[in-house]
Amino acid sequence: MFTQAAAIDFQIINALFTRVISACDILGIDGDFAKELEETLAELPPIKISERYGTIQEWIKDYEETEPGHRHISQLFGLFPGDQINETDSAIYEAAKKTIARRIENGGGSTGWSRAWTVCFYARLKDGYNAGEHLGYLLKNCTANNLFDIHPPFQIDGNFGGVAGITEMLLQSHLGTPQNRIVELLPALPEKWSSCSVKGIKARGNFTFDFSWRNGKVTKLSVTSAEDNTLLLKLNEKTTDIQTDKEYTVEENILKMSFVAGETAEMNF
């Protein structure tokens, strides 16, 4: 099918333009060019919800789907790896849930890389159960004995995507502003992973995290910043009763803690 204005095209353009605008602001350069990009962004078609299916439209027009279980789910680029689709817009977020559910119900995710992408989608949707189930399917049915992802031929997309999905299940840092990303721990934790630990996981802002959890709640956390920066950590039922020697403030359930390059903070919960 050929059409103007495929959803993925404008989601990629949105991701590119917003990052270039942010870079111009941080570096203090090319202000006129950044303004031109902002004006162009305002003219792009918005993400649309299909009146037929309640899903994210793949095209500018609300076409009838000819292959609802297709392995490609391009209209959700803005959910992952992009960040345009997120919980700040509940209607679009719910439509994204319906989009992936409809694909899977009709046989989607049949290849290794597509199944890995599905893991990433469910992680961003904060659905630990489905993220874990599709990760299990990826490892059991789409992975060779040597751990190569299979399409059936080897495709490294599935290996990289699977690791990305696991990372997103344990830590996310895509929300907030480009210079002030909000870190959330255990956003999509399966019940089977109720007590465990992870080391060396990176977050936007050049932070490195080591943390442990028990019964789905963080118990110990070590954060190292590679540069002068401020950590914004989302607090919820998984991160309560903070104990640390380092100063911090909390506003609207966001912990704010300043770091100098190379500094490490230890926290217990």
Feature annotation, model-predicted:
Residues 129-245, 249-269:
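Non-catalytic C-terminal accessory modules of carbohydrate-active enzymes
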Residues 6-175, 182, 196, 219:
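Active-site core of glycosidic bond-cleaving carbohydrate-active enzymes
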Residues 3:
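Aromatic (Trp/Tyr) and acidic
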